[in-house]
């Protein structure tokens, strides 16, 4: 298996999708019988838009490539949090391989996108078009029932850099970007290959790809920096904002006891993260201030639960001294933090 991500041109991907659908009644190996269609008539509302399901793929390497986003959509995902991008990218951010270990609970040692920011952007726009096409062509929905959420990190200086600013602005409105024009042209030139997707449907695709953004910060990021970045997204970029929170907010004793109770006594925590990461009272105070600001701006603030949990590498599972835990062992911590925050805000927090 290659250790590099290979990008598929939009026209080639479209040809692949249409030919596989015709020949095998499947797309990327997913049979038509498995394609999800909301038959209940119930929807989740977020930012004034409707989602057929409140589910989405975990934001990781899987949500870097357009074809994986398509696969997630076909199987029922409708809230697509795109893989985090940052100023330091591509070959400038070397990743030790293997970088993911998932025998039971999951671990990784990779940081952000392995693609250059412009390449990641192109993948997300290709996916945006492809989902609109399949939504109509397959009869999965008459109107858009999915949403993209961009994710960026990891400090305000990097986020304000020209590269990152171009990315954010391009997600806010993609109409004048090269990849947007390319995808439109490809679909126009192939419009006669569709049975249900029309030129009118193409013209209806909104260039506002992401009305919301998720802030990802490194473990140990000062609370003042987190709040400065969130303020920037709300005030300057006019974006609904999610702040990614760490499971360390629960405190070391709770995390240790919970992992032990689930049979994960062999997981060794790094105690210093519980000291230097954002503390729960500070998080609550910050979120209350951000909610007040968002309300003034007619925007919304929320949290993403949770970031990974740093643990020690003791058995050479992956290269290095520390790895980041996710998977089912993290789920109980995420749900516990969600419950704690929900009680603190009386349920009034996305």
Report the location of each language-model feature:
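N-terminal capping/small domains of soluble enzymes
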Residues: 1-236
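Glycine/Thr-rich beta-alpha phosphate-binding loop at enzyme active sites
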Residues: 25-38, 251-348
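Extended, H/D-rich, highly charged conserved domains that either
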Residues: 221-238, 242-255, 274-281
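Contiguous hydrophobic segments
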Residues: 123-144, 241, 253-257, 305, ...
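Histidine (H) residue identity feature
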Residues: 31, 196, 219, 240, ...
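Active-site-proximal loop/turn and secondary-structure-junction residues that shape catalytic pockets
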Residues: 61-63, 86, 245-251, 307-311
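Short, well-ordered coil/turn segments that N-cap beta-strands
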Residues: 51-55, 76-78, 237-241, 297-301, ...
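Conserved beta-strand positions in the central sheet of alpha/beta enzyme cores
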Residues: 81, 242-244, 304
């Amino acid at each position: 298996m290659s250790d590099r991500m290979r990008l598929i041109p939009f026209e080639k991907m479209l040809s692949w999708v249409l030919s596989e659908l015709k020949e095998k009644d499947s797309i990327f190996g997913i049979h038509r019988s498995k394609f999800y269609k909301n038959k209940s008539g119930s929807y989740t509302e977020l930012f004034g838009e409707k989602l057929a399901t409140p589910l989405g793929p975990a934001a990781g390497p899987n949500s870097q490539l357009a074809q994986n986003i398509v696969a997630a959509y076909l199987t029922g995902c409708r809230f697509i949090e795109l893989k985090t991008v940052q100023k330091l990218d591509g070959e400038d951010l070397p990743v030790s391989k293997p970088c993911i270990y998932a025998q039971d609970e999951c671990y990784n040692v990779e940081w952000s996108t392995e693609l250059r920011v412009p390449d990641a952007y192109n993948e997300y726009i290709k996916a945006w078009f492809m989902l609109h096409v399949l939504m109509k062509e397959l009869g999965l929905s008459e109107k858009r029932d999915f949403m993209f959420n961009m994710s960026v990190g990891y400090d305000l200086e990097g986020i304000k850099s020209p590269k990152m600013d171009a990315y954010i602005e391009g997600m806010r409105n993609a109409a004048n970007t090269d990849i947007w024009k390319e995808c439109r042209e490809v679909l126009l030139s192939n419009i006669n290959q569709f049975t249900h997707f029309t030129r009118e449907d193409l013209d209806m695709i909104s260039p506002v790809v992401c009305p919301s953004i998720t802030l990802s910060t490194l473990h140990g990021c000062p609370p003042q920096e987190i709040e400065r970045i969130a303020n920037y997204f709300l005030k300057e970029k006019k974006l609904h904002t999610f702040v990614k929170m760490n499971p360390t907010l629960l405190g070391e004793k709770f995390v240790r006891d919970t992992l032990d109770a689930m049979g994960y006594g062999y997981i060794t925590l790094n105690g210093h993260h519980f000291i230097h990461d954002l503390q729960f009272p500070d998080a609550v105070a910050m979120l209350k201030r951000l909610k007040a600001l968002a309300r003034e701006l007619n925007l919304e603030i929320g949290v993403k639960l949770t970031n990974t949990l740093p643990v020690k590498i003791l058995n050479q599972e992956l290269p290095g001294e520390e790895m980041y835990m996710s998977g089912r062992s993290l789920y109980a911590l995420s749900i516990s933090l969600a419950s704690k925050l929900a009680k603190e805000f009386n349920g009034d927090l996305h």
